[in-house]
Amino acid sequence: MWHLKLCAVLMIFLLLLGQTDGSPIPEVSSAKRRPRRMTPFWRGVSLRPIGASCRDDSECITRLCRKRRCSLSVAQE
């Protein structure tokens, strides 16, 4: 009879031990974290959509920068 009690105690212990591994405790931070900004390297490397501001043709997905905007056509009225 004592082995049934021991088995029950071990099962309860194992169940409780499994619960402690469930989810991490969230860190309490007094200061809000800022989202990471894109570095100048990635800002220059990433291709921009039509209508986005640009400095030269290499920044645009269409490879056409007209009047500091990414354009779809070569000649713009």
Curated annotation (Swiss-Prot):
Offer a single GO CC term for the protein: extracellular region
Name which cysteines form disulfide bonds. 54-65, 60-70
The UniProt entry's GO biological process terms, in alphabetical order, are: defense response to bacterium
The record, for InterPro entries, names: LEAP-2
Kindly give the Pfam families that the UniProt entry links to this protein.
LEAP-2 (PF07359)
Report the subcellular localization.
Secreted
Q: Does the keyword Membrane apply?
A: no
Signal sequence: where?
1-22
Its domain of life? Eukaryota
Q: Does the keyword Secreted apply?
A: yes
Sorted keywords for this record are: Antibiotic, Antimicrobial, Cleavage on pair of basic residues, Disulfide bond, Secreted, Signal
Spell out the residue numbers of the propeptide.
23-37
What is its biological role?
Has an antimicrobial activity.
State the similarity comment.
Belongs to the LEAP2 family.
Name it. Answer: Liver-expressed antimicrobial peptide 2
Species of origin reads Macaca mulatta
